[in-house]
Amino acid sequence: MSEKRSLPMVDVKIDDEDTPQLEKKIKRQSIDHGVGSEPVSTIEIIPSDSFRKYNSQGFKAKDTDLMGTQLESTFEQELSQMEHDMADQEEHDLSSFERKKLPTDFDPSLYDISFQQIDAEQSVLNGIKDENTSTVVRFFGVTSEGHSVLCNVTGFKNYLYVPAPNSSDANDQEQINKFVHYLNETFDHAIDSIEVVSKQSIWGYSGDTKLPFWKIYVTYPHMVNKLRTAFERGHLSFNSWFSNGTTTYDNIAYTLRLMVDCGIVGMSWITLPKGKYSMIEPNNRVSSCQLEVSINYRNLIAHPAEGDWSHTAPLRIMSFDIECAGRIGVFPEPEYDPVIQIANVVSIAGAKKPFIRNVFTLNTCSPITGSMIFSHATEEEMLSNWRNFIIKVDPDVIIGYNTTNFDIPYLLNRAKALKVNDFPYFGRLKTVKQEIKESVFSSKAYGTRETKNVNIDGRLQLDLLQFIQREYKLRSYTLNAVSAHFLGEQKEDVHYSIISDLQNGDSETRRRLAVYCLKDAYLPLRLMEKLMALVNYTEMARVTGVPFSYLLARGQQIKVVSQLFRKCLEIDTVIPNMQSQASDDQYEGATVIEPIRGYYDVPIATLDFNSLYPSIMMAHNLCYTTLCNKATVERLNLKIDEDYVITPNGDYFVTTKRRRGILPIILDELISARKRAKKDLRDEKDPFKRDVLNGRQLALKISANSVYGFTGATVGKLPCLAISSSVTAYGRTMILKTKTAVQEKYCIKNGYKHDAVVVYGDTDSVMVKFGTTDLKEAMDLGTEAAKYVSTLFKHPINLEFEKAYFPYLLINKKRYAGLFWTNPDKFDKLDQKGLASVRRDSCSLVSIVMNKVLKKILIERNVDGALAFVRETINDILHNRVDISKLIISKTLAPNYTNPQPHAVLAERMKRREGVGPNVGDRVDYVIIGGNDKLYNRAEDPLFVLENNIQVDSRYYLTNQLQNPIISIVAPIIGDKQANGMFVVKSIKINTGSQKGGLMSFIKKVEACKSCKGPLRKGEGPLCSNCLARSGELYIKALYDVRDLEEKYSRLWTQCQRCAGNLHSEVLCSNKNCDIFYMRVKVKKELQEKVEQLSKW
């Protein structure tokens, strides 16, 4: 809280004729218009008795009830509605949180166990003698009844393939046995056996003959990598076999190898038949699961995730959030700063309401309707009890917002500092300690991010921040910004420096903090449900076959690898271990037909290829297994077009007559499965099942589209530029062929009213102007043209008419906007692509102005109104009337830069100035301020700019942010000259702050007259002698200005109170993603300045 300044009481006499509308009583009070202070009137002009005066309550709760009854926030009302769910739970009774007990008569010889496995990991199970191996894969899961399971799958040996030596004695079993003995002497008895098998390599077509391979089984899974290295580097010396090194095959992790061979996919159901599994004895159990069993891998039954086995078990999902009490000016550090509250919300997958809502608090806390409060005298006790709560509740999924990089590591480090030794054991394995591992995740699709990984065995972790960063491109990823974007609501955002004040207050202020903390725990659960994060990732794990945990920790390639291994297993095919390395090889991308730029006030029909790249791969049989060369063609006497084709870029692939490729088979299955899922989705009525089916069809679509990218990844598991470049080459020829076919058929010469013109084409679509002004006619022609062009290409390539644009503004390649129509009666939306209005690296003002301009031009057809709005915006920028929140630019912080970047320089400055700053992967908000320094040195934190009265660089925002995007929109309509003319500004005066040195050191600063701005003489008041005669008039105007600002500040204050849901307490919110916050700070600053000016009268 800022220090209050006491101003003297002053009585002022005002003539009736000067202020007929005002009362004659004016008094001056002390004021504190800090961000966290209530809008107490400084100049109280009392027009009537109905004027309300607010009294500041500070941080301590008062007995005075200003509003009659305490108002609850919307969130508290939600909690109140849930209250009946907790009627049967006694306060402080953890037993009510436990899972349903197992039947007392449970007998493994009488009951099958079917469970949905949610996590898998390799481990060692002592005391199990199953085919001389103690290595197991542990599957954690949940039954349909909600019982937790740990299933140890035993007996599976890891293996790799090598080509059998090209030697006469390579098939001699005695020689093979000697080689096994040699390997065991070399690798400490790590080899179990060698089996001779017939396989084909996935790489290249050389005929249909299978070749001999050795399948080498190892005793310990980790020995595969050592053995693989020895084979590939030629370190083995036996009968001259492999002395020059050889390629090894099927390089895949042990856990995934078992899942592939057993037909288990991620998040699928497994059945353990009665009599085939054994219960782990109580004294040998290592987990807290209700059922802990072991089974040989040959005896388990894996169910495909379809039909009756597509449902989801009643998974327990726990969302939590913590609050820490930091020191002044320092971001909380676990070595010094306590955890003061932990809020928890627990729900069942598919349920509408959470069945547990509680807060663990340090010190007392007033009750919260619909929630349980567990108060503790010491932090050690709170942390220990929270850990016990986790064990009792036994969540299957732990979610939150930034829990991976902050909450969980902070709790572990804090418990370590306090020596709470039992705390880091809240996973499902009793003796496995939770530990932090720091890493850097980097991929082309997701960028580079610093992350911390904590092993919580048996419990899935789904950090909604990481999920949203992967799946959505937003300007800001704060919980506030994300909630506003997806849920349409804001939340109070209390700065960490204020949290200590609330904690050190009383039980009421701690209650306010608890409600805040509880909402931060509840929002991730709502976001997960809204975005179907758990459902979509479950279906992605099922479709691609990988464990759920891979989806957040790994990139895209492992998903395709898993599908390839599964299909190869079916058809006796092995995959070579390719040495992944960067390559400079490039291939030509998709064709973009040169756009005919302009504004089209006639319908533009858009023809789209349905799943273009997957369709090309299927139609032309493009695959690793079908790739061949000229020598193979000659050796096998293959006939062109019948046995093989030459792609547009010169690569050879055999046709389906010779062999159907694995990739086309996978794609065909994915697309067919998606059609089935979409059909089931249309027929399904149950909302949760609909969500599951929708998640499945999305996962199938994404998986099909990622296969092409997998082949083109030069740094990857199995790159093949012959495939990826052939796909894009076919795509280019198809786009050009479509253009030619449409323009040749739909022309006046063939009896049509107009000559059709393809105005633009990009990757998988072409935009056609048929010439008609009638929208329905254009849509009918588009449908007809799509059917006609589809006949020119091989199945399953299909061109569809999906939409028309009318009107249509074509600016450049990959940049256009238009009204989007799927039926002629009503447009669907205003669609944009590639414009600054949908980009994240420009300020929101650009998006606001462009959207408004496009709306006026395309929807209202009011070009003059659009131009007037642009001129008005330019004027507002020049006169500093644009709210600073609209000028914020946001960019992601990368680890390294060749040249200084504004946001990176600011991040370092913030760390030096405030002790804490953005991390790699975070988005940094900044504005550009005035001055003559280099641009990267003029990036500044928006709040710092407001608080220190620093002026932004108007010219930068006009020329570097707004000018080019707006000109690109209006120039096609009004011409380049007039469009550029709107941004011609002769001069802009920018206040860059005080200057020192040079001539400035001889200049003395003096006060200026509040009316004429002339210099004041010593001893003169706010007005110079020339303006003194107008003192009364000017004073009344100043009073009006102050009153207007007070009224505005009160409205903003009330708006913030309503958002926080508490109209009787201080506004503590510092949400930097909220326009109201910046407006409140700015008005507060202006009000303080006006009050100080008025005090000089």
Curated annotation (Swiss-Prot):
Its cofactor is [4Fe-4S] cluster. InterPro entries: DNA-dir_DNA_pol_B (IPR006172), DNA-dir_DNA_pol_B_CS (IPR017964), DNA-dir_DNA_pol_B_exonuc (IPR006133), DNA-dir_DNA_pol_B_multi_dom (IPR006134), DNA/RNA_pol_sf (IPR043502), DNA_pol_B_thumb (IPR042087), DNA_pol_palm_dom_sf (IPR023211), DNA_pol_type-B (IPR050240). GO terms for cellular component: cytosol; delta DNA polymerase complex; replication fork. Binds 1 [4Fe-4S] cluster. [4Fe-4S] cluster binds at residues 1056, 1059, 1069, 1074. In eukaryotes there are five DNA polymerases: alpha, beta, gamma, delta, and epsilon which are responsible for different reactions of DNA synthesis. This is DNA polymerase delta catalytic subunit. It comes from Saccharomyces cerevisiae (strain ATCC 204508 / S288c) (Baker's yeast).
